Structures are given as structure tokens and as C-alpha cells.
């Protein structure tokens, strides 16, 4: 990949180099949203973000996963993208759900690498669960109890919005896809939140027609 700036424009970097970040000491875990969008604003085709990506995007995703302690994902995204166990040994995927209506025989949960994140009043589940909040998942409490330094978030829109509304997001790792969504668009972030919060561009790189950008919270 070729860096575009604002630091070291024109230099070459691979996905692992781009994903390697110095993070300042932080009392709470670092929460980083990873998402993809197109020139016409689509974030999904027929409910899935996978078709918008390609080999460069997949390698970048794997690089971000290699540098996190846990993956956090909404139940709808996990179902739509048919999540399986992560390829990295020891990495676990925490699925956020209020209803616990999940396929616990799926490869993700059968592998023992899937965790359910839900409310204290949700039904019992046959796998490991982390619970906080009554009626609504208390994401701040959940993230604090995961024992993770870096939480890598893979959507969907409702989870992204909830994390932003709770002021829990430290960085956004955004892929710009060269594909167009047309009528099959989706929102990267669903519901309104305080738009006064600002993120600053700290790095960007290009691989083919894909552009990767990292924004960090301005505090």
C-alpha cells in the first residue's frame, strides 16, 4: 500500500504496518470501529458488507484483528455475514444481542470462541455470556468487563450508533470501496447522536482502488 498522508505521504506500508498503532495509556479499553463505505454512501449490498470488499480490504481486516484482544459485533451482522470462528488462535468474538435469538450450533459458538453479550434480563444461553443492563445492553459496563485492551468493532449500524452515543469510541478505521451500492445501501451508523464529537484523520493509504483511513477521537 502507498501512504497518502497526513504522515509520510508516498511511503510504502503493508496492512500490518498500517494497523500497528501506538495507543496512549487509557483507563478504559480502546474501542475501534471498523467499517466500509462506497462513493455513493453504501455500507452494504443486500444486507451484507462483504460484497463491497475485496482482497485488499480482507487483508486489512485481518491486520486489525491481529492487533485486537476481542471482536465485538451485533447479532444482525454476525448472522448476515455468517460469522465463523476467527482464524487467529485465542481471539474471541462477542455478539451483542437483546433477544439471544442466535444459532448456538453454528461454527462460531460450537468452536467455543463465541461469547454472547446481552442484558441481565435476557434468556439463559448455552454458551458463555457477559451481561449488563436491564432491557438495554449497558455497553460501557460490558466493555469494561471484557478484560480487553483493544476492542475491535465490526458493526452493524445500531451497535456503532450505540457506542458513539455512549462516547465509547476512540478510533474509526474506514475503508473506501471503489464499488457502488446503488439502491442496495445501508447506513454505517443508525440513529442520531451528539455530532459535536470530532475525529481527526491520522493516517490514510491506498491499495489499488481501495483507500484506508484511520480517524482518532479528538479529546
Residue ranges, per PLM feature:
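Enzymes that bind and transform nitrogen-containing heteroaromatic metabolites
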Residues: 1-219
Amino acid at each position: 500500500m502507498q501512504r497518502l498522508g497526513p504522515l509520510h505521504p508516498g511511503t510504502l506500508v503493508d496492512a500490518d504496518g498500517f494497523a500497528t498503532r501506538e495507543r496512549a495509556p487509557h483507563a478504559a479499553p480502546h474501542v475501534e470501529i471498523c467499517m466500509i463505505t462506497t462513493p455513493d454512501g453504501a455500507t452494504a449490498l443486500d444486507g451484507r458488507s462483504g460484497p463491497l470488499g475485496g482482497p485488499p480490504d480482507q487483508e486489512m481486516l485481518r491486520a486489525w484483528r491481529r492487533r485486537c484482544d476481542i471482536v465485538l459485533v451485533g447479532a444482525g451482522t454476525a448472522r448476515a455475514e455468517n460469522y465463523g470462528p476467527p482464524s487467529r488462535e485465542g481471539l474471541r468474538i462477542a455478539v451483542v444481542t437483546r433477544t439471544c435469538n442466535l444459532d448456538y450450533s453454528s461454527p462460531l459458538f460450537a468452536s467455543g470462541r463465541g461469547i454472547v453479550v446481552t442484558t441481565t434480563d435476557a434468556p439463559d444461553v448455552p454458551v458463555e455470556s457477559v451481561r449488563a443492563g436491564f432491557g438495554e445492553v449497558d455497553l460501557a459496563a460490558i466493555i469494561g468487563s471484557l478484560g480487553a485492551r483493544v476492542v475491535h468493532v465490526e458493526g452493524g449500524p445500531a451497535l456503532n450508533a450505540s457506542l458513539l452515543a455512549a462516547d465509547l469510541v476512540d478510533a474509526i478505521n474506514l475503508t473506501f470501496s471503489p464499488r457502488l451500492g446503488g439502491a442496495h445501501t445501508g447506513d454505517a451508523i443508525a440513529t442520531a447522536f451528539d455530532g459535536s464529537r470530532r475525529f481527526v484523520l491520522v493516517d490514510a493509504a491506498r491499495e489499488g482502488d481501495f483507500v484506508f483511513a484511520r480517524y482518532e477521537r479528538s479529546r
